[in-house]
Structures are given as C-alpha cells and as structure tokens.
Amino acid sequence: MLLLGFGPAELLAITLIMVVATVIQMAVGVGLSLVMIPLLAIISPSLVPGPAIAAAFVVMAAMVRGNSHHIDRGEIGWGAAGLLVGTAIGVLALTAIDPTHLPRLFGALILLAVGLSISGLNLSLNARNITVTSVISGFMGGMSGIHGPLIGVVYAGQNPAKVRATLGLYWIVAYAMLIAMHVAAGRFGFADIGRAALLVPGIVIGTWLAPYAMAAMDRERMRIAMLAIAVAGALVLLIKG
C-alpha cells in the first residue's frame, strides 16, 4: 500500500529522519535542514526543498513558543532584507538547472554548509554581518533549503535562549519567503503540501523526545553527530547523482 507514492518502509524512514533532525534542532538551535535535506533527498528528491521546508514551520514555531521575549526584532529586520534578496536569486538559479542535476547540487551545497559550520569563522553580531550573511544564506536556502551555517556563526556565543528564539523566528521568515517564491516559480503545489504532511509525525515525536535527549546527551556530541549525518548524506547524493 502506497501513500503519495511512498511505501511503509519509506514512510518509517521519513519519520525517523524527522525525529532525529527535530531533536538536534531543538537541542543545538541549528541543524534541522542539514540533517533532513540530504537524507530526505536520498529517499526522494520530491521531498526537498519545498515539502521539507513547509513542514519545518512546525519545528520553528515550537522553538519560538514561550521564548518570544528573547527575540531581537531589529536583527530580524536586517536578516529579512538580506534573505529576500538571496532567496530570490537562489530560486531563480534553481529554476534554470536541469532537475537530474539536483541531487549532486544538493550534495555539494550540503558539504559547503558543513565546511562553513566548522570553518572557525568569527563574525560579530551587527547589522552589516546579519544582512550580508542573510543574502548568502538566502541564496543557499533558495537552492537547497539549507540556510543555516553562516547566520549561526554570527550568533555564536550569544545567550542560548536568545539564539533559539531569534533564529526560530528568522527561519520562519526565511521559510515563508522560500515557499512563496517556490509557489510563484511553479515549484510548490498541492502535492507538495501532502508530502509535507508526511513529515509532521516525526516532527511531533522529535519535539516530545527533545527534552529527554537534551538531558541525556552533550550538545557538542549532538553537533558532531549532526555534521557526520550531513556529510554522509551529501556523499550519498554526490555518488548516487
């Protein structure tokens, strides 16, 4: 029996991927896209980036809920301006690419994202850096659905509660722009909404499990696991093509 073209084994794998990705995002503050995009793309490129990003709204809403007083709306404004420009360029570039090349493109962008995450860059938190990194993040997100590494570098060392809340709203803004532009470009429709719904059970389970995982595991070990999963998934995409 198939559901939207996916069999029981694939649906189980999708759920497990979203559980792991959600737990890492809730614990570390970043990493949802780095984990889910390459692994979901291995199952089916039709799950990324649109359906995966649409489902991710649930995770980001959970991050913001109860922590909205930590959000710096001025920083969100600077970020939104950069995201708008970068996302538009990324989506336009994506529409010009042969779909058969997308798995390798996603794999390459994921490896770039991992490289940025471990690069040791030190960027101060100011309007210029937020805007510039948001343009780059928007471009990467428009192409692959992975926005995070550079803006995460800008927020390194900040209060964890502020990071979770502010970046949670930042991702909501980024994802809303991405989905809107994919709709305008004809790359997101009703079938994608159905695919996004397939990801929600794993998100719900992951949100419930996150506090227990955070108590049992060190954040740095989770971060290392996140990067290892992302690299493995990217290599499979590059080899599989």
Where on the chain are the PLM-derived regions?
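Membrane helix-loop-helix hairpins that form the core translocation module of multi-pass transporters
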Residues: S46-I118
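Interfacial loop-to-transmembrane junctions
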Residues: W78, W208-A230
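Juxtamembrane boundary at the C-terminal end of a transmembrane helix
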Residues: L2, L235-G241
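Small-residue-rich hydrophobic segments that form or flank transmembrane alpha-helices
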Residues: E10-G77, S134-V135, G141, G148-T207
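Short, strongly hydrophobic alpha-helical membrane anchors
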Residues: M1-E10
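Residues within membrane-spanning alpha-helices of integral membrane proteins
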Residues: I53, G107-I110, V114, G168, ...
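Helix-loop interface residues and adjacent transmembrane-helix termini in multi-pass membrane transporters
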Residues: I42, H70, A96-P99, G157, ...
